[in-house]
Amino acid sequence: MKRALTAPALFAAAAVVAPLLATGLASCESGFERNDQIVNSLRILGAATHIDNGDGTDWADAEVGDTITLSALVANPNAIATVTVTWVTCLPNLNNTLTPCADENVLQNPVNLIGMAGVLQLGVGETIQYTVPSEVQPLLDQLVTRADANLNAQCSVYIEAPLIVIAQGSDGSVVTAVKNLRLSPWSLTGPGASDPALQHYIRNANPSITALNIPSDASACAGQTLVASCKSDADCDGGGTCSTDGWCPPAPFPAGNQLICGQIPATDVDIQTYYYCGLDGVDGSEMEYPTITWYSTGGSQGGVTNKNTAGTPDLASRTFINFTRPSAPFTLYGVVRDGRDGENWIAQAFQ
């Protein structure tokens, strides 16, 4: 059975994080948690953190000095003329007093956070870049100290810093969502770490979707390809052009009810193995089990029944969906999450 993943206890210097997690941004409407799969208004469907350290891996964990590419998946089915996306968080408060990001009165209208004292605006845009400042280092140092002193902390050498994403339409519509930025002293952790207490935290990488398929059976996502990922035009059949977001031209989407799936590479990066700890330290390891949440601007959806009721949900129930397209053009979204703050997606328009 897949275990629940919990963040470590946070420290006084990270007062921004604990209150924000405690409130859960209850007054905000998270685009990730809404269960209506038909997108008919401005929505934030996902948000991801991407760190490129030059090794070819799309990392999700960051440490001081890393430049993070923050990306939001914003759906705008009604073609609002202008949508402004703002990313904010709150500065750490060493006195453990209430920050604007944890003030329920402020969060009733999250737009008020923009420009407030104590609120750090990371940038404006669906995709922005942000470099982790040196002020975060004391938090990471305390994570190391905590792992050295507590056996049960050796598998969770990270903190989650919630980022607030605010999308404002020129028509007056506003939606918000929360993305956890995972911060870890990753250069000190892993199997090769010199400190034994840090050898059992595995830096998290983002999962990926490499194709949208109509599978030939429910045991694997293989069959007729509707759209495939690409890095260049050479990856696309028939001389197609690789899009700026890395997808080849799509095939026609057939009418009628179709079983479709998102293909997730079965590699150590896309589906990682990580350790879990108990009171006496490391208890074992297990694999991630990525799940895809599906959205569309039209049509109808139906879930796939899990056949593995005794343990982790099977592949089909996690990454497949029954879908009937509308007669008009539509966009299909698939957001994959690994349960460890890693995230990616496909957003494909079909005629």
What are these regions (language model features)?
Residues A228-T241:
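Disulfide-braced loops of extracellular cysteine-rich modules
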Residues N53-T67, P249-I260:
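Short, solvent-exposed loop/linker segments at the N-terminal edge
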Residues I80-T86, M287-Y295:
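Solvent-exposed loop segments of extracellular immunoglobulin-like
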Residues I159-V165, S170-T225, G342-Q351:
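Short beta-strand elements
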Residues M1-A26:
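Sec-dependent bacterial lipoprotein signal peptides
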Residues L73-A79, G169, I264-Y275, V282-G284, ...:
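Extracellular acidic, Ser/Thr/Pro-rich low-complexity tracts
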Residues L20-G54, G246-C248, E343-W345:
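Bacterial Sec-dependent N-terminal signal peptides
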Residues L70, T89, D141-S173, G262, ...:
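Internal, hydrophobic beta-strand segments that form the core of beta-sheet-rich folds
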